[in-house]
Amino acid sequence: MSSSVYESIIQTRASVWGSTASGKAVVDSYWIHELGTGSLLVQTQLYSDSRSKSSFGYTAKVGNLPCEEEEILSQHVYIPIFDDIDFSINIDDSVLALSVCSNTVNTNGVKHQGHLKVLSPDQLHSIGSTMNRSDIKDRFQLQEKDIIPNDRYIEAANKGSLSCVKEHTYKIETCYNQALGKVNVLSPNRNVHEWLYSFKPSFNQVESNNRTVNSLAVKSLLMSAENNIMPNSQAFVKASTDSHFKLSLWLRVPKVLKQVSIQKLFKVAGDETNKTFYLSIVCIPNHNSVETALNISVICKHQLPIRKCKAPFELSMMFSDLKEPYNIVHDPSYPQRIVHALLETHTSFAQVLCNNLQEDVIIYTLNNYELTPGKLDLGERTLNYSEDICKRKYFLSKTLECLPSNTQTMSYLDSIQIPSWKIDFARGEIKISPQPVSVAKSLLKLDLSGIKKKGSKISETHASGSK
């Protein structure tokens, strides 16, 4: 998806921030980077509330693999051990992604928290208690995007009624590597001989309220959008398989699942780097408290040094056998995504027309001018448009005719953030301008082929819908 779609999703989720009825519900996102290279080792998003609890641990100290019969797995593996949660693992040549979804979870309207960390095998010296962003980048080899989201995403969150200002300094905390998240009896404080450095943004807003957030909270919203994390997700993990690791998840699910214990030692067919994976799943139900402890461990160990050029491979593992479909928890950003896709398609057609005519084209107007039809023949396709008595060109969408002709509609369309739009509130019009001739020629063929693909997926025919 494009960055503009991510902006729309962030704005929509920010607009319902904190509206959940569960005051103890929270989404925690974690990013752990490697000291020395700054590369992202793992990113995790966990949901917890008064009954659902989620925590995880990550370490580069793997040790010996358990003794199990080794298997070679390829493409799609189906192991139906759960009938009331959705659990899957996907592995390719660079990452392992793990997802646990349950219909006891609804992250819509839940507040997010972000936690940025760097993993080190040894304790560092001469690290102050506060550092600015540039010093963090130099000392820990992090990039700007690792620390703080792009301005456009912060602006999108603020348009969604949050209040976020970019921070410049961070409080640095050091601790032994241990379990993270809602640590409880299911995830004991298991220290590993590694160090974690945490970076907490220093709050820089004079006045604050319950809509005031730091930039890592916005980064958490962005992580949900980029990874298409569903609202019923209790745990999502994406770990780089370019490094040795042991990943542990300790979840408490507030319903009774059947007792399960499964272990697998395997390699993936087509993996030239010869990685070995170990998977352990233990499910312990408690009928008295109507809850289940779900403990998952994944180990990735390399038998050969990882080469830069890797042949692609993919493995999908499904562990669910849902007897009935969930009562789906709908993401509130879905309508915004549909509108954005429709308007992007309409604008793409209009841009082709605009580039060929080499003049501005109005794609929306509040005014009810008398228009006469016109046609532009492009060989493979004919674009219908209209023009007024002043010879100004129009490429209007029937979809937008259902909206009231007032400034609220203009403000709504402005919030969708199509980059090429020029919005004139005074005239009540939205128009686009021609691209440079060299750019237009190079993109014409791509535009038309891309539009044809989009048009086949969207029921409305925008080209013939002009008046």
Curated annotation (Swiss-Prot):
The keyword Protein biosynthesis does not apply. GO terms for biological process: symbiont-mediated suppression of host innate immune response. This is Non-structural protein NS-S. Multifunctional protein that plays two independent roles: viral suppressor of host RNAi (VSR) and viral inducer of host attractiveness to insect vectors (VIA). Acts as a suppressor of RNA-mediated gene silencing, also known as post-transcriptional gene silencing (PTGS), a mechanism of plant viral defense that limits the accumulation of viral RNAs. Also inhibits signal transduction by the phytohormone jasmonate, making the infected plant more attractive to aphids, which are the second host to play a role as a dissemination vector. Acts by binding to and inhibiting MYC2 transcription factor. It comes from Tomato spotted wilt virus (strain Bulgarian L3) (TSWV). The keyword rRNA-binding does not apply. InterPro entries: NS-S_bunyaviral, NS-S_N_bunyaviral, NS-S_WIV_bunyaviral. Keywords: Host-virus interaction, Inhibition of host innate immune response by virus, Suppressor of RNA silencing, Viral immunoevasion. Belongs to the tospovirus NS-S protein family. Interacts with host MYC2.
